[in-house]
Amino acid sequence: MGVTIHYRGRLNNISLLPELEEELIDLAKSMGWNYVKFDDDWNEELHYTQEIKDGSLQMDGNLGLKGIVIIPPGSEPINFTVDPTGQLSSFFRQMSIIDKVTAEAMDWVFCKMQFAEISVHIWIVELLKYLKKKYFHDLEVHDEGEYWETGNVKTLQEKRETINTAMDKFSGAFESGEFAGQKNASAEEIVNNIESFFKKFIQKKKKKE
């Protein structure tokens, strides 16, 4: 199943949503990664329908989500979508609410890292740290790779089986964007470069403010 990152939290203030969306879009563009913006109607009743079309499951309706979903290479989409209260929420959670199925596990948003490079895992954790400081003060994170808790690359490597396997597969994750050309970088160099990226990004935002 691969290492998974679980996270949950609520926006400090719902009025911060437009700024959060702008920053996430800016970050995705800086990385050369795809993203999707969701802007459901919070005044409309929640509903959804599912059907098999052209061999795939398709869904339509109003799940009551606003925010950004970032799509890194090799990773599941990373949801930064919120409900009307500012609570981070996923499609699964909103669908469970509609279906009147409640479970504490549904309060956690998660992203499986099975096919993502180790650098993507580190990048996501650094992003979550940044968002916790600025937008989600009560953000909780459970990282099965333990990088959030320890900052220990070796531990993360062990959780992901072996770093050699991960780096051998590191072929296209950062061929475009901020980290192009780092195929042969060490794990420590990747961490330093990602941290440097976020420091520069924050400084850039402060200058604009």
Task: Tell where the protein language model's regions lie, with residue ranges.
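Acidic (Asp/Glu-rich) sequence patches and key acidic residues
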Residues: 1-209
